[in-house]
Design a protein with these regions (language model features):
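Short hydrophobic targeting helices and cationic amphipathic motifs
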Residues: 2-3
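Flexible "arm" and connector segments at domain edges
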Residues: 15-160
Length: 160
């Protein structure tokens, strides 16, 4: 599933902000859902992923001796299907509820990948959470044409 930018009017040098520059094109608006409501919802989903895997005997225990890469490689078709369903919901204008459900399906399957890997999946979640928590507006900026948070220094190719 790829969303394409049909037109980018800025050059890469205009996209990459200076270290002391603040992106004034975007205005902050507070999150529309409370932190605890969001965290509780994700936690309920994680618990259901674990229960689902246990119920259908498809969890991490069945993959003993396989590498995390092999486990996920064998599951990618599930995630591909969910991305395709999201793309279809968007392109066929099925509405916000369908798009929200397909987005949640992607999250459910991605969380399933992490559980299926066992400890390497949990370690990956912890590394990414720690890395994301360390990002600040001084170290990272929002690329205006994509909305992606990127490092201000060290990866100029990502600003092109």
């Amino acid at each position: 599933f790829h969303l394409k930018n049909t037109e980018i009017s800025r050059s890469s040098s205009q996209l990459m902000p200076e270290n002391n520059q603040i992106n004034t094109e975007r205005k902050y608006a507070p999150n529309t859902v409370g932190r605890q409501e969001f965290v509780d919802s994700i936690s309920r989903m994680a618990a259901e992923v674990w229960d689902f895997h246990n119920r259908f005997e498809i969890g991490s225990g069945q993959f003993e001796g396989q590498s995390a890469t092999d486990i996920v490689a064998n599951r990618t078709s599930i995630l591909d299907e969910e991305f395709n369903e999201l793309a279809q919901a968007i392109s066929e204008k099925e509405g916000d509820e369908a798009v929200a459900d397909e987005t949640a399906d992607i999250l459910f399957v991605a969380m399933g990948h992490a559980e299926a890997m066992g400890n390497p999946g949990i370690d990956g979640i912890d590394r990414v959470s720690t890395k994301s928590a360390a990002k600040t507006s001084k170290t990272h900026a929002i690329r205006p044409d994509t909305g992606k948070i990127l490092p201000r220094e060290g990866k100029p190719h990502k600003w092109q």
